[in-house]
Amino acid sequence: MSTFDNAIADRPIGLTAPSGIDRAAHHRLDEAWLAAAWSHPTTRVFVVSGGQVLIDDTAEGGTEIVMTPAFEAPITETHRYFLGTDEDGVSYFALQKDSLPGRMDQPARPAGLREAGLLLGPRDAGLMAHAVALENWQRLHRFCSRCGERTVIAAAGHIRRCPACGAEHYPRTDPAVIMLVTDEKDRALLGRQVHWPEGRFSTLAGFVEPGESIEQSVAREVFEEAGVTVGEVEYVASQPWPFPSSLMLGFMARATSSEINVDGEEIEEARWFSREDLTAAFESGEILPPYGISIAARLIELWYGKPLPKPGSIG
């Protein structure tokens, strides 16, 4: 298999492009520095709630997260997360709250990461992904896995510490492989999960299991879901996927067999597509492409040779 010259880095989407933010982890335990940063007039803060933030589609530079000066934002009974600093020295924080604030003085609307990740620039998309991932982790890991006692937030949102036994718990990231498989005829293997809308096809994917390399995981997942064996595996790119805590590792893989036998549990249907087959299926509305924010769309585009149609623009 040849190396792809038009790598994802050449056409990054919001969650794969460099954000320009230095996460500055060395400041997370420095309470004096955090307090000074919070009171600095350039520091900006936004609210995250239920995986959503407020965005402004009318901003001069394009869609942006609605942020306010940190010193104007009350922090009582909220979780405050330090997200990092930019090249100009501006610090960014997120506040986790039960609901998003009302904004009557400017255009704003709530949006989740699947939508906002396509609209926001790299800086704001990266900040939102960081904040949403921390919010999900905080929500799901409130108790100590060692002794069962309630934990408290530390390190500006990046540690949960157990006062009872002293254990420290860190945000988890679950590695998952996602791969576009091609055969000797250069056809692409796409599948449809049981719970997806009718006609939605995408790449195969699955979690890496304990004691397994990512290459082994690619081969296992493809065989389990579609009954196809693979040989050569080529890493392409990664993407954070905080729904709630995955890191998607993107691959191209070459099949060594072509007979499909779906598992019927995760994958309901799988098919080989030539580029001509896929174009015809898109144009007829038979097939719906994966959502644009997903690295799946970029993997398919690397093989397809051009952008996929946007969902809702076909059929």
Language model: regions and residue ranges:
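The catalytic Nudix box helix
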Residues: 202-237, 251, 257-259
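Cys/His-rich short segments
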Residues: 130-180
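Acidic pyrophosphate-coordinating catalytic loop
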Residues: 167-170, 239-246
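N-terminal strand-loop-strand
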Residues: 160-202, 207, 229-230, 253
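Non-heme Fe(II)/2-oxoglutarate
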Residues: 247-270
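Nudix hydrolase/Nudix homology domain
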Residues: 1-141, 152, 196-201, 263-315
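Conserved hydrophobic/aromatic beta-strand scaffold that supports enzyme active sites
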Residues: 82, 143, 178-180, 190, ...
